[in-house]
Amino acid sequence: MKRDHHQFQGRLSNHGTSSSSSSISKDKMMMVKKEEDGGGNMDDELLAVLGYKVRSSEMAEVALKLEQLETMMSNVQEDGLSHLATDTVHYNPSELYSWLDNMLSELNPPPLPASSNGLDPVLPSPEICGFPASDYDLKVIPGNAIYQFPAIDSSSSSNNQNKRLKSCSSPDSMVTSTSTGTQIGGVIGTTVTTTTTTTTAAGESTRSVILVDSQENGVRLVHALMACAEAIQQNNLTLAEALVKQIGCLAVSQAGAMRKVATYFAEALARRIYRLSPPQNQIDHCLSDTLQMHFYETCPYLKFAHFTANQAILEAFEGKKRVHVIDFSMNQGLQWPALMQALALREGGPPTFRLTGIGPPAPDNSDHLHEVGCKLAQLAEAIHVEFEYRGFVANSLADLDASMLELRPSDTEAVAVNSVFELHKLLGRPGGIEKVLGVVKQIKPVIFTVVEQESNHNGPVFLDRFTESLHYYSTLFDSLEGVPNSQDKVMSEVYLGKQICNLVACEGPDRVERHETLSQWGNRFGSSGLAPAHLGSNAFKQASMLLSVFNSGQGYRVEESNGCLMLGWHTRPLITTSAWKLSTAAY
């Protein structure tokens, strides 16, 4: 539905505008009439979900009141607005009907003394967010206009009555802006303050106007995202399509993490509406591998995952002469140099270290796992660790069989199995996770380390998954805001954006981002014959020290839960490291 609410801008006028007002009124009436003839229900839905407390059937009366307000404001002298109450409801323009009534009543008070310093009327601007008024369809409504009162002497006040506030494009105007972040229900909103100072030819300041784009747009953006997801769940794609277009405009008005998160979720929603699934092929896997390296360099989440898992493995290998690690998430092998160095420094000398890496095939059919193994072999030679390596290419961990791993007797070789952000990808394949856990039982490891996202993105209801993922990734993006701008940071955001796109836009086996919480994984592991192995207090202390490198540790938080370690941002856990072993009944 078309709307005639526009961005507030300062305007000075003491001339009548009855003829133009009449023309505007007719246009408004015709526009409202057209809207009432068709699409009224859709307009009411859009108004409701975006927080506007007015019906399309009331727009004719709203248009008349707008005309009255415009006429009254254009006829009020410069001192005619000083009586406006500071607590009047026009601070909430979403309630259009009551807002207009209160504005009209405020503009018709007893006359004030001539000496009072007032301000000139504020009239709607014909454009918002760069869209012409004729195309304006529930676009973002900015915040309030707040006036500062400059010192004006009596000799200059009479001259000011005939002046209009100049636009910011004037060479005599100066614009400054600042922004601060605020958190709204787990999503970051932004308050943008713009100060415009207009000067005369002599350089004198005549008026200062501060336009404040408050948290209202951020709240409206979140409501639009949720409403769009709900419309998709109800298969109301017409409404969802209209809402996703609104989200784009609302996101532009934000800054920082809020804008980035909303943009990625808007893209994912659009892909789901128009059935444009993101690619799921070998090239995409290779790209994700590269993006994960940037994510590793940018923030502590992967470093925390590797460090805590390595600490658990190191303790489990204590006193063993031959050790074997089977890595379900080999990728670039970033986890293992630190473990190899720790083994090299072990009292009594390093053990013989065997590493089996499992990863997806490369798009060019190159043996990238072999290349990773060669680099690790060079490191092992430099630190005097006897090293053996073998790589396995598999499209899925569910294709793995224990007989492929060349297992040796447990009394001669201790085995550890490691998985970082891999097991959740099996949940979309029927029987996939059960098969892999069965292979783990056949391996009989002394320890099975698992790192997964601490969130439930695998429920049967799309709206619930969307809500949880919106909060989760908003927190993740917020934690990245303290990182200096760099290519690593940009690529890290793309890495997370790809996860959002898969989680929201895909279904069935194509949806691989099926994260679950620690309690859910605990139930799965318990039913497969695995028992928790508590991580030691030493791992907790050293993980806390690791975080001090990132943003001086501010914002990040490590906490222990049932023998597992969680890393979060402020009060929200984001990833969890857990360790498991075969239960007594499994032997």
UniProtKB/Swiss-Prot annotation:
Q: Which residues does the annotated region (Leucine repeat I (LRI)) include?
A: 219-273
- In which residues does the motif LEXLE motif occur? 66-70
Name the segments for region: SAW. Answer: 505-581
> Which intervals of this chain are the motif LXXLL motif?
423-427
Q: Where are the disulfide bridges?
A: none
Residues in coiled coil: none
Q: Name one GO biological process term.
A: negative regulation of leaf development
Q: Motif VHYNP motif: residue span?
A: 89-93
Q: Which residue intervals define the domain GRAS in the entry?
A: 212-581
Q: Where is this region: VHIID?
A: 292-357
In the record's own words, the domains note is: The DELLA motif is required for its GA-induced degradation but not for the interaction with GID2.
Q: Which family does it belong to?
A: Belongs to the GRAS family. DELLA subfamily.
What's the protein here called? DELLA protein RGA
Encoding gene per record: RGA
